[in-house]
Amino acid sequence: MQLIRSSDYGFWLLSQGSHIHLVNNYLPEGRAEDFHLQGKKGMVIGELDRQPLWLVEEQPNDTRAYFDLRDQLYLPERTFNLLNRGVELNHFFKTHQFCGKCGDKTMQTEDEWAVQCTNEECNYRTYPVICPSIIVAIRRGKEILLANHRRHAPKYGKGGMYTTLAGFVEVGESFEQTIHREVFEETGIKVKNIRYFGSQPWAFPNSQMVGFLADYESGEIRLQEEEIADAKWFRYDEPYPEFPEKGTIARALIEATLKLCAEHQDK
């Protein structure tokens, strides 16, 4: 990052954790001095509406109004992904101030998004950590499997949002192996015909959601109760529970699978 000058112009992204500063529901636009940002550290991370998008180093004691990045899912995909980029970079810089190899201080590199050890005998370079997570929608004929995760259920019970299954990729696993493992661990179900669907950066704090469609192969629902409060097969034409928000890859997976369910019914 560089010192921001009074005359620097563009959109300004300030973050605190996964929250971002907004003015009238949008990123502030103007000269740095308009927002008292001169002298702070920042860098351009992209372009928004043909103007530079500046990421400002996280200001822990800033009193501006900050809003949850999750609430910005209505924005165009490219805009939301740029905001994810900024939030993830600030998280990376904040959590990698010391070298993971020798323990000396790090400094941000000028040629790429990375930090490098200041110890000349080490010079170890570290890049932003991205933690891939699979997310999968499972179809059985004209039904979709949806789960009520513990984090979405009211305390001590069921209810709330039902969504797809997801889980982090473990060391040495392919995405397909993760799908088989996670689905079986959480529901006791085995799947087949796994197809890639799409992906979404998810800066909470540094995930990449990799989406798949899959078909039911065998098994009866058996819950991993510490993770899953409930899981059911829902017909495409029956009343649905609460779904994830539009703009999430989970919602897109569900809608794509419900369409496949309807097409199966018509055959």
Curated annotation (Swiss-Prot):
Cofactor mode of binding and number, as noted: Divalent metal cations. Mg(2+) or Mn(2+). Binds 1 zinc ion per subunit.
Keywords: Hydrolase, Magnesium, Manganese, Metal-binding, NAD, Zinc
Catalyzed reaction equations: a 5'-end NAD(+)-phospho-ribonucleoside in mRNA + H2O = a 5'-end phospho-adenosine-phospho-ribonucleoside in mRNA + beta-nicotinamide D-ribonucleotide + 2 H(+); NAD(+) + H2O = beta-nicotinamide D-ribonucleotide + AMP + 2 H(+); NADH + H2O = reduced beta-nicotinamide D-ribonucleotide + AMP + 2 H(+)
Binding site for a divalent metal cation 1: A166, E186, E227
Xref: CDD domains: NUDIX_NADH_pyrophosphatase_Nudt13
Superkingdom in the source lineage: Bacteria
Motif Nudix box: positions: 167-188
GO cellular component, one term: cytosol
Boundaries of every Nudix hydrolase domain copy: 128-257
Record PANTHER family: NAD-CAPPED RNA HYDROLASE NUDT12, NUDIX HYDROLASE, NUDC SUBFAMILY
Assembly and oligomerization: Homodimer.
Protein name: NAD-capped RNA hydrolase NudC
